[in-house]
């Protein structure tokens, strides 16, 4: 019987290539998923997978390649994410998260979703990675944004060093994040006017000058935040500074 343990699929005499799973694609279409290989790297198990849609004979890698990663792999992550970007625990279900997507990236950045103590941090990170300010699944990011994230809890620290891929002096505070979206924000990643964000999720934000310390000052903040706790902050290059094709972390 197939089991899921800390980001790894476990099965007696399990061998990649010997098993085909029944699943659904991101658009809810039924697919068959073949596990072609498994490799341990950086404390995580990465799977090469291929999928076949119903009534098709063609097997393809569902993970979209980039110039840097031609054959993306996937992590096995407990739970499923709906169209709003919300994570749901569904008995017996897990997600194959492609390595170039927010779910897998947040794991490699330090928030292991199979660690119960980090589940909310990981979910807040996925909102940050997508710049999902309203927490409704809409993304305000784009390729090659340069981001530095930190949580102040000792898991991921703010970057203060100058490196070839990141300059702290050029990055400014963007937002603080919860699993439900932005807790507050100073600006948007793509220079979308803050008024437009307020229109996209009416009743969610109000103008604010909350000072979170260390230069992190909000322009908009959640109207109701009594039951929420900001978990992740991020800084990024303002849009006019987006000149380098990399992400710190």
For every predicted segment, state its role.
Residues 2-249:
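Long, compositionally biased low-complexity segments
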């Amino acid at each position: 019987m197939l089991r899921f343990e800390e980001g790894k699929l476990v099965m007696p005499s399990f061998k990649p290539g010997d098993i085909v799973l029944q699943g659904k694609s991101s658009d809810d279409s039924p697919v068959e998923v073949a596990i072609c290989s498994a490799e341990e790297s950086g404390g995580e198990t990465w799977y090469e997978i291929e999928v076949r849609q119903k009534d098709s004979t063609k097997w393809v890698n569902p993970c979209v390649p980039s110039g840097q990663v031609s054959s993306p792999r996937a992590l096995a992550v407990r739970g499923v994410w709906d169209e709003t970007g919300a994570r749901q625990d569904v008995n017996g279900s897990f997600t194959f998260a492609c390595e170039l997507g927010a779910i897998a990236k947040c794991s490699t950045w330090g928030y292991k979703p199979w660690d119960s103590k980090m589940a909310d941090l990981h979910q807040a990170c996925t909102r940050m990675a997508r710049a999902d300010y309203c927490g409704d699944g809409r993304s305000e990011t784009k390729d090659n944004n340069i981001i530095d994230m930190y949580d102040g809890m000792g898991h991921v620290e703010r970057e203060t060093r100058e490196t070839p891929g990141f300059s702290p002096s050029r990055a400014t505070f963007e937002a603080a994040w919860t699993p439900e979206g932005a807790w507050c924000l100073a600006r948007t990643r793509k220079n979308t006017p803050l008024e437009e964000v307020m229109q996209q999720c009416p009743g969610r934000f109000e103008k604010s000058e909350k000072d979170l310390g260390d230069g992190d000052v909000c322009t908009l903040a959640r109207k109701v935040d009594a039951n929420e706790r900001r978990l992740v902050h991020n800084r990024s290059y303002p849009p006019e500074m987006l000149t380098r094709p990399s992400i710190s972390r």
